[in-house]
Regions:
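C-terminal regulatory/oligomerization modules of transcriptional regulators
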Residues: 1-12, 134-172
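N-terminal leader segment of winged-helix/HTH proteins
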Residues: 1-42, 89, 169-172
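Short amphipathic alpha-helical segments with heptad-repeat character
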Residues: 21, 25, 29, 71, ...
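N-terminal helix-turn-helix DNA-binding core of bacterial DNA-binding proteins
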Residues: 25, 29-74, 87
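Charged, amphipathic alpha-helical coiled-coil/dimerization segments
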Residues: 32, 82-142
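Residues within helix-turn-helix
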Residues: 63-64, 75, 82, 102
Length: 172
């Protein structure tokens, strides 16, 4: 019985920064879960969808350059890419000068799938826009950029947006 009372007290003393951390985690997980459900008819995971969209916007890319633009992967995306190659969505083109290097491009099927993912993303964003309708979005974005500044995912997203640093993103 004493434990239940202690747990109630613990919930009352959660620090605001701790609450923020868990809210960010919960929002990310819920968003990922909802997006995964939306992608299910395409038989793609959110990570695979991200690879397709990054290639759609930036192809051709080396495996290393792709990895530098992904938020879903902090290491090499080789396994992720391999699955997309096996599904006929991505093509690996060997370098003529360095056999260790490959260039990644979308196949015709991959371009079609990336377009489908883009349409699903638009529907997803529209369906969830009401959640942030009256929120101070510019301030929230500024805070989140500060939160990821200098971290691999923040750096990858800044690169993907065509900015060298998160600071350039914050200045907008």
């Amino acid at each position: 019985m004493m434990m239940d009372h202690e747990n109630e007290q613990r919930a009352d003393v959660m620090q605001p920064i701790e609450e923020l951390r868990y809210l960010i985690l919960a929002a990310q997980r819920e968003g990922n879960r909802l997006f995964a459900e939306a992608l299910r008819p395409l038989r793609l995971t959110p990570s695979q969808a991200e690879v397709l969209r990054v290639l759609q916007d930036h192809e051709p890319l080396s495996l290393i350059a792709l990895g530098d633009l992904l938020v879903c992967e902090t290491g090499s995306p080789s396994r992720l890419v391999q699955g997309l190659v096996e599904d006929g969505l991505v093509e690996r083109i060997p370098s003529s000068t360095d056999k260790r290097m490959v260039t990644l491009t979308l196949t015709n099927l991959g371009r079609e799938m990336a377009a489908n993912v883009g349409a699903l993303e638009s529907q997803f964003y529209e369906a969830n826009a009401g959640v942030v309708k009256d929120a101070p979005l510019a301030e929230i974005l500024e805070f989140l950029w500060r939160f990821v500044e200098g971290k691999p995912a923040g750096i990858a997203l800044a690169r993907r947006m065509g900015r060298e640093t998160e600071r350039e993103t914050l200045a907008l």
